[in-house]
């Protein structure tokens, strides 16, 4: 059996045309079945499992073994908490359950810091972050009473949904299960098919053409030039800032479109991840358009709960201070989620402080307009020019944050001595 796994080819998720050929061929019977109001649960499970295994195969079987252990761990936690929640509701039991659900991911983040040569954890695997969001979200919704009864099969189907397995979008159990249980009508399925073709074409443009131009043809030489010029900041670093930011968007948005396309073919309308984020007029709007499934998850499961706790215990008298502290903690946690390096943490702090400043400006603007109204004056201008200025400022602030996120400043400011 182990020999068979070693002989399997490795297929990078949405990595090349060969992958798409195999994948579309595999999910085509699922879509045809939906057209005749039928699902093939066992076949769908086998397709998902097969492609997940092919994503995780490689030099060794560590990722496959880790995934198996991880799924068993989360199943035990989720169903133990579901059983407990039917009769009891203790805060500490809930906190411990969430902590234990996050523990495998935290371990994979911490392990490289504990080794001399930054070796990755043996317990990590592709997609562990996104599976953790699903598991933790499920526990929280069980606590809230939103989820009460669900089977092992339903939970595994949700956790191991292949199109969004490796990098999202992040879904919620109820939304996913409702899609699965309610097969769309033929007209809607045809619309979903048309949408899938659109997503695939746009995804190919984004990921394989535009991301290649920005991420390979432009970014690599600009990085080399910036490192040669040195210093705190230089003109080539400015080029790195914009090319990296655009590469990040086109690469990730392209991947997300592929995930949405294949989800549609399997009868699931997964959440949209990007909605023209560079049209945002301020930072709050940006987070309502950028990596939306992640930002909405943090909003619902971290920010709102943190605000509720702070208000309940009257930690701060001023509600604006409460929301400001919650913004910073929320975005810091997001930074830590990306990785335990100074630039990821600084990225989270950057956006937390940015959202605080954004809210402060909105409040200030409202006050100015109220005062102007009392004086019989017109409000501050809000037209295409001011909106355009807001878009310009937001775009550049976001690009600066992406430069921080990229880790390139770590190379520029703290160059490592050459290996002898």
What residue ranges belong to the model's regions?
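Membrane-embedded transmembrane alpha-helical bundles that form the catalytic cores
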Residues: 2-420
């Amino acid at each position: 059996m182990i020999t068979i796994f070693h002989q399997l080819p490795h297929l990078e998720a949405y990595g090349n045309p060969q992958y798409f050929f195999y994948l579309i061929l595999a999910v085509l019977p699922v879509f045809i079945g939906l057209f005749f109001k039928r699902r093939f649960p066992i076949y769908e499970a086998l397709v998902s499992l097969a492609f997940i295994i092919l994503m995780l195969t490689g030099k060794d079987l560590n990722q496959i073994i880790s995934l198996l252990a991880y799924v068993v761990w989360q199943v035990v936690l989720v169903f133990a908490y579901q059983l407990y929640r039917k009769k009891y509701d203790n805060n500490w039991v809930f906190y411990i359950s969430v902590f234990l659900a996050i523990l495998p991911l935290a371990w994979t983040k911490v392990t490289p810091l504990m080794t001399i040569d930054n070796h990755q954890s043996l317990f990590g695997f592709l997609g562990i972050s996104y599976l953790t969001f699903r598991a933790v979200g499920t526990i929280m919704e069980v606590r809230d009473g939103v989820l009460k009864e669900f089977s092992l099969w339903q939970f595994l189907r949700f956790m191991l949904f292949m199109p969004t397995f490796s990098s999202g979008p992040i879904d919620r159990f109820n939304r996913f299960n409702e899609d699965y249980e309610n097969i769309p009508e033929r007209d809607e399925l045809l619309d979903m098919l048309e949408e899938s073709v659109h997503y695939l074409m746009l995804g190919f443009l984004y990921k394989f053409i535009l991301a290649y131009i920005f991420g390979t043809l432009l970014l690599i030489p600009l990085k080399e030039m910036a490192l040669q010029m040195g210093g705190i900041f230089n003109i080539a670093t400015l080029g790195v800032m914009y090319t990296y930011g655009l590469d990040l968007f086109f690469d990730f948005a392209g991947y997300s479109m592929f995930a949405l396309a294949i989800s549609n073919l399997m009868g699931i309308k997964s959440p949209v991840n990007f909605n023209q984020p560079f049209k945002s007029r301020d930072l709050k709007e940006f987070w309502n358009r950028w990596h939306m499934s992640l930002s909405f998850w943090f909003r619902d499961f971290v920010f709102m709960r943190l605000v509720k706790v702070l208000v309940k215990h009257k930690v701060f008298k001023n509600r604006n201070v409460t929301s400001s502290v919650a913004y910073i903690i929320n975005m810091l946690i997001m930074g830590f989620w990306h990785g335990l390096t100074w630039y990821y943490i600084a990225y989270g702090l950057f956006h937390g402080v940015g959202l605080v400043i954004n809210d402060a400006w909105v409040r200030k603007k409202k006050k100015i307009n109220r005062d102007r109204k009392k004086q019989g004056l017109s409000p501050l201008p809000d037209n295409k020019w001011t909106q355009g200025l807001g878009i310009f400022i937001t775009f550049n602030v976001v690009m600066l944050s992406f430069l921080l996120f990229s880790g390139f400043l770590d190379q520029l400011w703290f160059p490592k001595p050459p290996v002898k």
